[in-house]
From Swiss-Prot:
Organism: Californiconus californicus (California cone)
Keywords: Disulfide bond, Neurotoxin, Secreted, Toxin
Post-translational modification summary for this protein: Contains 4 disulfide bonds.
Maturation propeptide residues: 1-21
Expressing tissues: Expressed by the venom duct.
UniProt superkingdom: Eukaryota
Metal-binding among keywords: no
One GO term describing the cellular component: extracellular region
UniProt name for this protein: Conotoxin Cal12.1p2
Subcellular location: Secreted
GO MF terms, alphabetically ordered: toxin activity
Domain remarks: The cysteine framework is XII (C-C-C-C-CC-C-C).
């Protein structure tokens, strides 16, 4: 779809728009899946996420900084 295709430059296809990303909350347990196609890293379960291919994504999952 348009959302996915507009952000593919060498990255995995499962990329979500910021609008959809903000509606999801990262689980506190490391390795737990979250709805935007990321999972939490073992060493940074409070926010830093990897995509399902294991590449670190340089953003913090929504809902983690204050909870």
């Amino acid at each position: 779809d348009l959302i996915t295709n507009s952000y593919t430059r060498g990255k995995p296809r499962h990329v979500t728009s910021w609008r959809n990303l903000r509606t999801d909350v990262c689980k506190k347990s490391p390795g737990k899946c979250i709805h935007n196609g990321c999972f939490c890293e073992q060493d940074k379960p409070q926010g830093n996420c990897c995509d399902s291919g294991g590449c670190t994504v340089k953003w913090w999952c929504p809902g983690t900084k204050g909870d």
